Every structure is written in structure tokens, then in C-alpha cells.
């Protein structure tokens, strides 16, 4: 502000030019204006869109620029491998048909082909495309971690299960009520006090002697 040339206004007030925008202000006003003007001029402004300004207030919609799509990498065509697989499949089918007609055992099938674009799962050794492999490998990893067999852990688990079942359902001892016990005791006394009936010949109805009855039973 020291090198700026003052300018006399109509009211005999000295006006000093701004170093940034060139406008003239009084000394006290220039002190407030200077930092604000530098801040505004140093701030990066977005480029003015004249088309958007013209279309404002009209019914014409503004269409933004479509994002440029990245070119996808072109995969190599393995047509030769597909052609050889097709020929092998036809030859195998012809050999199977000929073996069926002649009554011979069927020849072994052709070996499976491996697609180089597929990703192999390190756990189950199966192959998937990129999208399916990203989902399957995580799932197969969790399943494989659950299948880890630990004999000590398995034995402890089985023992705890057996102990829990024994505590939940204890064996009940058979108890005989007083009424049932009295009935059994009366029947035993009746059987011991009842007289033995003599053996009777089924043909004549006559009583048989004890020794004769035993001998007839043996015969």
C-alpha cells in the first residue's frame, strides 16, 4: 500500500488501489478488503458452464456427460481346443455304438478337458469361472475348517453327551406295591397248601398209582 498512488475523491478523501483487483478504496476499507480479495482470487473456481446457465428456467433437461467405460480385455479364443474336444467326443460316441452292436465292453470315456479360463478351488479341486470362484472358495474354506477331525475332541464330545443323557434320564428301580406283594404271597401259600391230586387214566377214568403214572409218563 506504500507504493500505491493515492487518488483524491470528490470529498477530498484519498483512495488507494487494490493490488489484486485494481479497484480503489479508502485506507481503512482497503485494509479489510485486501485479505478477502486475495483469498477469493487464490481460490480455484469451477469452469463456468454456459450451456447450463442458458438452459436454467426452461423445460429442457440438462444431460451430463456419460462416464467413459473402460475397455474390457478381450479374452483369447481357444477355438482349437474346443475343436479337438468336439472331435474326441464324436469318436468316443462312435466307439461306444460299435461296442454295443458287437457286444463288447464299452471303451473308457475320454479324459475331461480343463478350461484354462477357470480357477481351481484349492480345497475341493473343482474349477469355476471368475464370478463363481470368488463365492465358492470362501464357502469351501469354511466347510473344510469344520471338517477337521480331532480324535481327542470327538471322544470328549461323545463322553459329555453320554453323561448328559444319563443325568437327564436316570434308571428307575422297580418297586412292588403292598397290594401286589400281598397278592403274590397269598398265591404262594395257596399253592403250597393245596393237596396233590392223584393221576387219572384218560381212557378209563380210573385212578392210577404213583409209580405207574411215572412209568407211563416215561414211556
Swiss-Prot record:
Q: What Pfam families does the database record attribute to this sequence?
A: zf-C2HC_2
Q: What does the UniProt keyword field contain?
A: Metal-binding, Repeat, Zinc, Zinc-finger
Q: Where does Zn(2+) 2 bind?
A: 121, 124, 136, 140
Cite the GO molecular-function annotations of the record. Answer: zinc ion binding
Q: What InterPro entries does this protein map onto?
A: ZC2HC1A/B-like (IPR026319), Znf_C2HC_C3H (IPR049899)
Zn finger (C2HC/C3H-type) start-end: 14-43, 117-146
UniProt: Zn(2+) 1 binding residues:
18, 21, 33, 37
Q: Where is the signal peptide?
A: none
Q: Which cofactor does it need?
A: Zn(2+)
Disordered as annotated region, ranges: 190-219
Top-rank taxon, per record:
Eukaryota
The record's PANTHER family line, in alphabetical order, gives: C2H2 ZINC FINGER CGI-62-RELATED, ZINC FINGER C2HC DOMAIN-CONTAINING PROTEIN 1B
Q: Which family does it belong to?
A: Belongs to the ZC2HC1 family.
Q: Tell me what this protein is called.
A: Zinc finger C2HC domain-containing protein 1B
Species: Bos taurus
Ranked from the top, the taxonomy reads: Eukaryota, Metazoa, Chordata, Craniata, Vertebrata
Identify the coding gene. ZC2HC1B
Amino acid at each position: 500500500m506504500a507504493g500505491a498512488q493515492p487518488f483524491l475523491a470528490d470529498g477530498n478523501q484519498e483512495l488507494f488501489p487494490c493490488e489484486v483487483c485494481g479497484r480503489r478504496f479508502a485506507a481503512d476499507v482497503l485494509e479489510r478488503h485486501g485479505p478477502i480479495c486475495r483469498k477469493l482470487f487464490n481460490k480455484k473456481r469451477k469452469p463456468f458452464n454456459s450451456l447450463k446457465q442458458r438452459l436454467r428456467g426452461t423445460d429442457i433437461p440438462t444431460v451430463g456427460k456419460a462416464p467413459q467405460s473402460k475397455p474390457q480385455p478381450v479374452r483369447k479364443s481357444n477355438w482349437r481346443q474346443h475343436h479337438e474336444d468336439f472331435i474326441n467326443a464324436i469318436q468316443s460316441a462312435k466307439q461306444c455304438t460299435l461296442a454295443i452292436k458287437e457286444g463288447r465292453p464299452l471303451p473308457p470315456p475320454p479324459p475331461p478337458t480343463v478350461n484354462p479360463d477357470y480357477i481351481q478351488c484349492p480345497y475341493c479341486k473343482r474349477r469355476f469361472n471368475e464370478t463363481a470362484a470368488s463365492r465358492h472358495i470362501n464357502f469351501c474354506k469354511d466347510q473344510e475348517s469344520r471338517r477337521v477331525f480331532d480324535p481327542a475332541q470327538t471322544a470328549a464330545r461323545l463322553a459329555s453327551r453320554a453323561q448328559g443323557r444319563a443325568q437327564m434320564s436316570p434308571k428307575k428301580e422297580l418297586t412292588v406295591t403292598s397290594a401286589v406283594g400281598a397278592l403274590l404271597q397269598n398265591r404262594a401259600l395257596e399253592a403250597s397248601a393245596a393237596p396233590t391230586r392223584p393221576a387219572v387214566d384218560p381212557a378209563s377214568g380210573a385212578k392210577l398209582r404213583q409209580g405207574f403214572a411215572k412209568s407211563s409218563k416215561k414211556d
